[in-house]
Amino acid sequence: MTGTSLTDTSSGLYFRDHSQGWLLRAQKQISYEVRLRDGIFRPECTDLLEQGAGTPGRSRRFVVVDSNVDLMYGNRIRSYFDYHGVDCSIMVVEANETLKNLETATRIVDEIDAFGIARRKEPLIVIGGGVLMDIVGLVASLYRRGAPFVRVPTTLIGLVDAGVGVKTGVNFNGHKNRLGTYTPADLTLLDRQFLATLDRRHIGNGLAEILKIALIKDLSLFAALEEHGPTLLDEKFQGSTAAGDRAARSVLHSAIHGMLDELQPNLWEAELERCVDYGHTFSPTVEMRALPELLHGEAVCVDMALTTVIAWRRGLLTEAQRDRIFAVMAALELPSWHPILDPDVLVNALQDTVRHRDGLQRLPLPVGIGGVTFVNDVTPRELEAAVTLQQELGDARTPKTSGDRGGRNL
């Protein structure tokens, strides 16, 4: 309707040329809460039941629980809902990147239909890691064109990244999160006590996303990881010592606040230059091609190592800063190189990211430690030179683990 006369009806509805055309403008107010709580399944803790409303006599909830979480916490979860008189159906789902697909999503929809949730007053509840939260978030966004839901992340990467934003999605056609929506959970409850049963590798996996925030916006957070990273790995954010507890609380708060601070003004990604995309230019392709060898945070760390080298070669970092970054990656027991990093793979990854970012690279690079800039001119030759140096630095820094590299993603 550009260039035509619009008549305002004072209600957000406009008509043109004696009602031969209309323009409707509407806004939707979005708010959601992220809350830190220790021990959310204690009987006296009612945070999980605040959303929605009960039906006469008894409230009802449909709960999706990760299969590993169910093994460790299933009895406690069921006892909690029984204690509060909640009629709940618990669906146990195996969730990993290979099962993050439409088939898993539609299985959940089938079970929701069988349970018969009320559209608005019986929010879905998801308890699990980032993969399961992404799937259930997508289901919630599509079910009856939008159902409320509550998230309880049980992994570190869920607490600091996947559980605090609004993205949902599943993998499709070999691409990570190719199908998805922007749908906030009504409430996210972050309980670090779940991390006590997480294996060491998955603590490191989440620390990679914390390191991302540190490198692009928070030098003090980087210094905290530099000083306390091994303790956080050892104590799994449980605060077994007074110093470890202070570090765990401070690092979690800084990482979550930093992420939300970046998301809030650009929640729907109208602006495609996003500093929180640091580490996510090459990693989606690298992660999918390396499945199941690399976890998400590990792929992000490999990406950050590559872009750290690119930044150093461009004079955005000193050699000392570059080496500090690689040293922290090693201290957090994260990989800083992987054999999948063939130059052709990286070029293909960058091309796909350019399409995702609407025709430009919009590649975030660290400026010093705690700053960021965006570039659009990285070349295949530059990638090849950078990954060669990355391999030299990564081979020297990446810890050689002898134990199981798998583990439960609770």
Swiss-Prot record:
Active site: 167
EC class: lyase
SUPFAM superfamilies associated with the record: Dehydroquinate synthase-like (SSF56796)
A biological process from GO: antibiotic biosynthetic process
CDD domains assigned to the protein according to its UniProt record, in alphabetical order: EEVS (cd08199)
Cofactor(s) this protein cannot do without: NAD(+); Co(2+)
Entry EC number(s): 4.2.3.152
Catalytic activity field: D-sedoheptulose 7-phosphate = 2-epi-5-epi-valiolone + phosphate
PANTHER family linked: 2-EPI-5-EPI-VALIOLONE SYNTHASE, 3-DEHYDROQUINATE SYNTHASE
Family named by the database record: Belongs to the sugar phosphate cyclases superfamily. EEVS family.
Protein name: 2-epi-5-epi-valiolone synthase
Gene (UniProt): salQ
